[in-house]
């Protein structure tokens, strides 16, 4: 999000799922789309099979989508910017750019041209391992299409240079004018069903709803008036998850309230996270299962599942949709909204008669009649969603921005201008991953997901059908590396990084390049995040889950 926000002014899919089939070229990177976003992968395959689209896949692994690729570039982990800068070099050098679009709708072109002047495909090959002719071919294929769309997911954002990766992709789209039309754009595929909605609602440390910055005096004043706060909303952005954990370890953070998250399995460098939790004085977990984090909490608040909730989700294409409960809440469980409002009322302490404004006891009224009342407040305070109402959502989903009651929603962003006015080229200098293989740790660990499970497995591993399909985690290793080490399928192997050790069954495969190891992070029995580091992107603060130097040993 941070990368696109700086480049375009908003951090979301520019286009809709429905217009994927109108693309002539699809560039997919950092996304195992078949397993992480299966519906979207079907649209991509339909574009290829039925409409003749060409797929450029950039992924070190031979994922299922590789079978459909016209070109498959397999860079070394963490070398994406080198490849993408080289593609920009080819686009400019061979005049595969739309100069009219650049002149009318962008800024910073001269700076980008200078930044990539020496980024030849041969230079990128030396860094990434991708043959120069493949990089040139990818640039020509992308630049030669009238409608080319870019898609990515956490394979390139969970990196110490994730923002650079995203901005390098946006540079390609800006160079070729691939915005504002069907089958074009830059399209981050969000990690789960309501990640987009959570961010839209201000679930980030630096914004209020609709990405209104907390540093904006007018935005804060508007919310203070609506909420009748007795104390100003802080103008300073809050802490990210990684900052919170460091703060706990240093003693600055004393308590955590965690909902819908399992940091003791899904956060990086788990020994570091465990040490941080040991320093906390008070932990509250609001969830539907007693996951690893809930098991050590001081207080557990039983929430409800999606099937028991009312409200809205916003999916990856910015579509706000109604969610209706299928069953009543189970005994002992409560709606998240009710829990939060009850807590708010307790903190508001209406019995207090102090005339001095108290930052812990605001005057805010927590008497919402239900989810619809909350949405009414969202619409009243959020310009990009002011035209969306429950009455309209009963008919169907609406894509923001939707700024009036008769506005149809916005399937395609940036048709005439970018949210920030002009699209901004970002001159980027290649930076490698924080860790690279060496004599002591000669392999590179990559982590990700599989189709059958999700994140820490809090829900999917409690599904008997899904758990029967994949009951345990495996450690994937290149088949030739396995042969060299005398490792056979099912052998127990030990993976060690600078942070810890995990033992699990080996799965030799020809889908990984030599020198790479792959693990999912769904399984508490073999927690991959014991191995991952806590290096973060300096802007987005997202951890580097995809590049950890490790060694392998037979047990």
What are these language model-derived features?
Residues 1-21, 186-187:
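Anionic-ligand anchoring segments at beta-strand to alpha-helix junctions in alpha/beta enzyme folds, i.e.
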Residues 17, 308-329, 340, 344, ...:
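Glycine/threonine-rich phosphate-binding loop and adjacent beta-strand/alpha-helix elements that clamp
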Residues 47-54, 278-282:
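A short helix->loop->beta-strand "cap" motif at the edges of active sites that frequently abuts
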Residues 49-56, 61-145:
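Long, well-ordered, tryptophan-enriched scaffold segments
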Residues 64, 289-324:
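Flexible glycine/proline-rich, aromatic-decorated loop/lid segments
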Residues 142-246, 406, 416-422:
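A glycine-rich, hydrophobic/aromatic-adjacent loop/helix-cap motif
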Residues 198-199, 204, 366-465:
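Long, low-complexity segments enriched in small/aliphatic residues
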Residues 234, 330-398, 440, 456, ...:
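Long, contiguous, secondary-structure-rich segments that constitute the structural scaffold
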């Amino acid at each position: 999000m941070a990368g696109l926000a700086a480049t375009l002014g908003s951090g979301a899919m520019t286009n809709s799922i429905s217009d994927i089939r109108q693309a002539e070229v699809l560039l997919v990177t950092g996304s195992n789309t078949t397993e992480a976003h299966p519906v979207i992968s079907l649209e991509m395959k339909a574009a290829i099979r039925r409409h003749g689209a060409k797929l450029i896949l950039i992924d070190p692994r031979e994922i299922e989508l590789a079978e459909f690729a016209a070109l498959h570039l397999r860079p070394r982990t963490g070398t994406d910017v080198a490849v993408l800068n080289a593609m920009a070099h080819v686009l400019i050098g061979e005049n595969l750019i739309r100069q009219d679009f650049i002149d009318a709708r962008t800024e910073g072109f001269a700076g980008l041209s200078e930044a990539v002047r020496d980024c030849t495909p041969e230079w990128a090959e030396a860094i990434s391992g991708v043959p120069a002719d493949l990089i040139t071919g990818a640039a020509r294929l992308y630049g030669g299409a009238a409608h080319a769309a870019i898609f990515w997911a956490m394979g390139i954002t969970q990196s110490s240079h994730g923002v650079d990766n995203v901005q390098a992709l946006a540079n390609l789209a800006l160079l070729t004018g691939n915005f504002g039309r069907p089958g074009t754009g830059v399209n981050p595929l969000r990690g789960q069903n309501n990640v987009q909605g959570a961010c839209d609602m201000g679930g980030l440390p630096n914004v209020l709803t609709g990405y209104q910055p907390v540093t904006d005096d007018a935005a804060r004043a508007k919310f203070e008036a609506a909420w009748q706060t007795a104390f100003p909303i802080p103008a300073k952005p809050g802490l990210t998850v990684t900052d919170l954990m460091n703060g706990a370890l240093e003693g600055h953070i004393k308590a955590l309230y965690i909902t819908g998250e399992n940091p003791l399995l899904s956060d990086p460098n788990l020994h570091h996270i465990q040490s941080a939790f040991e320093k906390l004085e008070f932990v509250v977990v609001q969830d539907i299962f007693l996951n690893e984090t809930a098991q050590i909490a001081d207080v557990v608040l039983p929430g409800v599942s999606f099937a028991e909730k009312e409200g809205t989700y916003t999916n990856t294409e910015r579509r706000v949709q109604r969610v209706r409960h299928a069953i009543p809440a189970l005994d002992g469980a409560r709606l998240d909204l009710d829990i939060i409002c009850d807590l708010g009322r307790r903190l508001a302490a209406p019995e207090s008669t102090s005339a001095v404004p108290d930052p812990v006891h605001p005057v805010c009224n927590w008497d919402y009649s239900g989810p619809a009342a909350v949405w009414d407040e969202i619409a009243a305070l959020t310009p990009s969603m002011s035209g969306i109402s429950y009455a309209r959502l009963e008919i169907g989903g609406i894509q923001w921005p939707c700024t009036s009651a008769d506005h149809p929603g916005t399937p395609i962003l940036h048709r005439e201008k970018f949210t920030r006015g002009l699209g901004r080229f970002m001159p980027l200098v290649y930076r490698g991953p924080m860790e690279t293989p060496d004599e002591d740790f000669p392999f590179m660990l990559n982590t990700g997901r599989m189709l059958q499970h999700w994140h820490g497995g809090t829900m999917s591993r409690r599904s008997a059908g899904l758990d029967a399909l994949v009951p345990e985690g495996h450690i994937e290793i290149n088949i030739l590396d396995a042969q060299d080490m005398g490792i056979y399928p099912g052998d127990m192997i030990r993976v060690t990084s600078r942070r810890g050790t995990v033992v699990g069954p080996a799965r030799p495969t020809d889908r990984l390049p030599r020198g790479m190891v792959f693990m999912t992070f769904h399984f508490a029995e073999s927690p991959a995040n014991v191995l991952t580091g806590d290096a973060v992107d300096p802007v987005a603060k997202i951890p580097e889950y995809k590049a950890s130097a490790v060694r392998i040993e037979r047990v």
